């Protein structure tokens, strides 16, 4: 009988890590109609190895180039060029999925490390919450 190995190494499927961290960002892009530069502040929902999901009040069009600055205590920790690959137009939580186009090694080391640090600072266990069954 044949043995099937389901490990990721046998399939060569890359593992992509995402860290759920809410870090402040500033996104800027040029509006195609007016030619004006739009600057919007927002928060990350998650940070991945080559992408991020950000909550922005004004969403850029899919396919547009966005300059993204990830902030920490009012200073920029990394600034990269990104491209919008998907938007979610939920009025209560508008989201844009951005893929990083440059400096992937720096993104992985800087943004991922900052996201891990954010989680460490904000991770709290609350054992006093009531459980709903």
Go through the PLM ranges and name each one.
Residues 1-133:
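Structured alpha-helical
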């Amino acid at each position: 009988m044949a043995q099937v190995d389901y490990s990721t190494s046998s399939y060569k499927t890359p593992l992509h890590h995402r860290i759920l961290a809410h870090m402040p960002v500033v996104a800027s892009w040029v509006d195609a109609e007016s030619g004006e530069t739009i600057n919007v502040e927002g928060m990350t929902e998650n940070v991945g190895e080559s992408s991020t999901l950000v909550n922005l009040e004004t969403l850029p069009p899919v396919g547009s180039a966005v300059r993204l600055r990830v902030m920490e205590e009012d200073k920029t920790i990394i600034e990269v060029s990104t491209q919008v690959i998907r938007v979610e137009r939920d009025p209560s939580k508008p989201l844009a999925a951005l893929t990083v186009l440059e400096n992937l090694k720096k993104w992985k080391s800087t943004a991922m490390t900052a996201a891990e640090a954010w989680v460490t600072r904000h991770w709290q266990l609350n054992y006093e919450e009531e459980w709903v069954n």
